UniProtKB/Swiss-Prot annotation:
Top-level taxon in the UniProt lineage: Bacteria
Species annotation: Legionella pneumophila (strain Corby)
Pfam families: GatB_N, GatB_Yqey
Reactions listed under catalytic activity: L-glutamyl-tRNA(Gln) + L-glutamine + ATP + H2O = L-glutaminyl-tRNA(Gln) + L-glutamate + ADP + phosphate + H(+); L-aspartyl-tRNA(Asn) + L-glutamine + ATP + H2O = L-asparaginyl-tRNA(Asn) + L-glutamate + ADP + phosphate + 2 H(+)
GO biological process: glutaminyl-tRNAGln biosynthesis via transamidation; translation
Role noted for this protein: Allows the formation of correctly charged Asn-tRNA(Asn) or Gln-tRNA(Gln) through the transamidation of misacylated Asp-tRNA(Asn) or Glu-tRNA(Gln) in organisms which lack either or both of asparaginyl-tRNA or glutaminyl-tRNA synthetases. The reaction takes place in the presence of glutamine and ATP through an activated phospho-Asp-tRNA(Asn) or phospho-Glu-tRNA(Gln).
Enzyme class label: ligase
EC number: 6.3.5.-
Subunit note: Heterotrimer of A, B and C subunits.
InterPro entries referenced in this protein's UniProt entry, alphabetically: Asn/Gln-tRNA_amidoTrfase_suB/E (IPR017959), Asn/Gln-tRNA_Trfase_suB/E_cat (IPR006075), Asn/Gln_amidotransferase (IPR018027), Asn/Gln_tRNA_amidoTrase-B-like (IPR003789), GatB (IPR004413), GatB_Yqey_C_2 (IPR023168), Gln-tRNA_amidoTrfase_suB_CS (IPR017958), Gln_synth/guanido_kin_cat_dom (IPR014746)
Protein name per its UniProtKB record: Aspartyl/glutamyl-tRNA(Asn/Gln) amidotransferase subunit B
One MF annotation (Gene Ontology) recorded for this entry: glutaminyl-tRNA synthase (glutamine-hydrolyzing) activity
Listed PROSITE patterns: GATB (PS01234)
Record key words, sorted: ATP-binding, Ligase, Nucleotide-binding, Protein biosynthesis
Length: 477
C-alpha cells in the first residue's frame, strides 16, 4: 500500500533581546545556573510581569518578512501544565489572538522547483527552564536562567510531505531569522528548536491520520533522521492492522529511534485563559509602517539580485548568503572595490574561507577588515600584483599586517610591466628550451603554460602573466 506523509512544523526561535520577555533578567547564554533569574522567572508571588517592547518589534519584523498579517490586537494567555522546570505552573503564551497570522515562505527544492510553505501563525511566549540530568548522579537539577527568555513560536500548516521539504523549509526559516537579526540561530545552544508533527494516510486520501509529535529537535540532521524513522514506524503499525497512538515522542540519536515521552495533549488540556496581569497589545498601522521601513536586506530579495549577476553561480550565491556577516562583508568589499564579482567571491570562498575554517573564525570577526580586503583586491584588479604574489601578501594580511603598499615596497613585490624587459626574458626562455619550442610549434599548445611558468619563476612571480602570455605567442608564432 502507498502512503502520503503529512508534516507540520513548530519552530521555537529565541529572540535576541538583552532581557527576558517579562522581566529585566539577562538572556545571555552560559551563565552559572540560576544566576540570571528574577522573582517572576522563579514563580515567586508579589511581582507582576512587564512586557519587553523589543520582543514585540521583532515579532512584527518577522511577520512582515513572511508577508503575514500583523494583528492590531493580540492577547497573552496562560497555558496551564505542570513540569519541574516551569515553577509558575503555567507558561505565558498566545493562543486565540496571536501577533502574526497567515504568512508564507517560498522554499527551493531540487530540479529548480519552488514550493510555498504556509505559516498559520507566529506567537510570542516565554521559554521554560532547563532540567540538568547530567550534573548530578542521584537527582536532576533545575536551571531557571532560560525561564522567561522570549520565544517566537512559528507554526506551519500541515503542508509538508517529505523530510526534504521539511529540512529545506527549516533552513530557509533559519536563514531568515538570522538575516532579520531577531535570532542567532545557534541550534547547539537551543536558540532554534523544532517540534515535528507527523502522520501518514493512504495515498490520495483527504482524511488525515493520527499524528505524533517529535519534541525539541535541534539539528537538521537529527530532524531528517527522526522524520524518516517515524514515517517507517507509522507505516509498520498501520500495515500490521494496528492504530497509531497520539503521543509526544523524543528522538534518540544514539540508536536512531524515537521513544514515547507522554500522551499528546489537546488544546483543552492546557485550559488557556487570558493572563489577568497583562493588558492586550494594540498595534497601529503607523508602528507597522515604521518597522517595515527599517527592515534589513532579506535573503529572498538578495538572492534574486545576485542571480542577475552573470558571473555568479548558485554555489557562489549560497556562500554569500551562508550568514548575514558573510553577506555584509561581501557587500562592503563590493562597494569599495572595482574588482569583478567573481574575483571577490573566489578569494572569499577560497583562501579566505580556508583560513577562517582552519583558525575557527567567521566573518563576524574577520582577521582582515573589509576595507583592507577591498584595497588588496583592487591591487589585483589594477594588475599591480600578480596572483602568485597576491597569495604571499594575503598570508601577511592574515597575520595582522594592514598596509598593503608597505608590504609591496618592503618585499619588492612590485609587478613587472615593462614590456621591453619582459620581452628580453621571453627571448631568453625560448633560446633556453629549443626542444619544447619545436614541440609547441608542432601543435603541443599545452606547453605555453610551461613557458609562462618559467617566466614567472625567473621574475619570482613579479611578471604580469597576461603580458608574458602575449609576448610568448608573438615570439613562438
Amino acid at each position: 500500500m502507498e502512503w502520503d506523509t503529512v508534516i507540520g512544523l513548530e519552530v521555537h526561535a529565541q529572540l535576541k533581546t538583552k532581557s527576558k520577555l517579562f522581566s529585566g533578567a539577562s538572556t545571555a547564554f552560559g551563565a552559572t545556573p540560576n544566576s540570571q533569574t528574577s522573582f517572576i522567572d522563579a514563580g515567586l508571588p508579589g511581582v507582576l510581569p512587564v512586557l519587553n517592547e523589543q520582543a514585540i518589534i521583532m515579532a512584527i519584523q518577522f511577520g512582515l518578512a513572511i508577508h503575514g498579517t500583523i494583528n492590531d490586537l493580540s492577547v497573552f494567555e496562560r497555558k496551564n501544565y505542570f513540569y519541574s522546570d516551569l515553577p509558575k505552573g503555567y507558561q505565558i503564551s498566545q493562543y486565540q489572538k496571536p501577533i502574526v497570522t497567515n504568512g508564507y515562505l517560498n522554499i527551493q527544492l531540487g530540479n529548480n522547483l519552488e514550493k510555498t510553505v504556509h505559516i498559520a501563525r507566529a506567537h510570542l511566549e516565554e521559554d521554560a527552564g532547563k532540567s540538568l540530568h547530567d550534573a548530578h548522579t542521584d537527582y536532576t537539577g533545575i536551571d531557571l536562567n532560560r525561564a522567561g527568555t522570549p520565544l517566537l513560536e512559528i507554526v506551519t500548516t500541515p503542508c509538508l510531505h517529505s523530510a526534504e521539504e521539511a529540512i529545506n523549509y527549516l533552513k530557509t526559516l533559519h536563514q531568515l531569522v538570522r538575516f532579520l537579526g531577531i535570532c542567532d540561530g545557534n541550534m547547539q545552544e537551543g536558540s532554534f528548536r523544532c517540534d515535528v508533527n507527523l502522520s501518514i494516510k493512504p495515498k490520495g486520501s483527504s482524511v488525515l491520520g493520527t499524528r505524533t509529535e517529535l519534541k525539541n529537535l535541534n539539528s537538521f540532521r537529527f530532524i531528517e533522521k527522526a522524520i524518516a524513522f517515524e514515517q517507517a514506524r507509522h507505516q509498520d503499525i498501520l500495515e500490521s492492522g494496528l492504530s497509531v497512538i497520539q503521543e509526544t515522542r523524543l528522538y534518540n540519536p544514539d540508536n536512531n529511534t524515537t521513544q514515547a515521552m507522554r500522551g499528546k495533549e489537546n488544546e483543552n488540556d492546557y485550559r488557556y485563559f487570558p493572563d489577568p496581569d497583562l493588558l492586550p497589545i494594540h498595534i497601529d498601522k503607523e508602528q507597522i509602517e515604521a518597522i517595515k521601513n527599517n527592515l534589513p536586506d532579506l535573503p529572498e530579495a538578495i538572492s534574486k539580485e545576485l542571480k542577475n549577476t552573470p558571473s555568479l553561480n548558485d554555489e557562489d550565491i549560497n556562500f554569500i548568503l551562508s550568514s548575514p556577516d558573510t553577506y555584509q562583508y561581501y557587500k562592503k568589499i563590493k562597494s569599495l572595490c572595482p574588482a569583478a564579482d567573481k574575483t571577490i567571491i573566489n578569494w572569499l570562498k577560497g583562501q579566505y574561507a580556508a583560513f577562517l575554517n582552519e583558525h575557527n573564525l567567521t566573518f563576524e570577526t574577520p582577521p582582515i577588515s573589509a576595507k583592507t580586503m577591498a584595497a588588496f583586491l583592487s591591487k589585483i584588479h589594477e594588475k599591480k600584483i600578480s596572483s602568485s604574489i597576491a597569495k604571499n601578501i594575503f598570508s601577511m594580511l592574515c597575520t595582522g599586517e594592514k598596509d598593503i603598499d608597505a608590504i609591496i615596497e618592503r618585499e619588492g613585490y612590485q609587478q613587472q610591466n615593462d614590456n621591453s624587459a619582459l620581452e628580453e626574458i621571453v627571448e631568453q626562455i625560448i633560446k633556453q628550451y629549443p626542444e619544447q619550442v619545436t614541440e609547441y610549434k608542432a601543435g603541443k599548445e599545452k606547453l605555453l603554460a610551461f613557458f609562462i611558468g618559467q617566466a614567472m619563476k625567473q621574475t619570482k612571480g613579479k611578471a604580469n602573466p597576461e603580458q608574458i602570455n602575449l609576448l610568448l605567442k608573438k615570439h613562438l608564432g
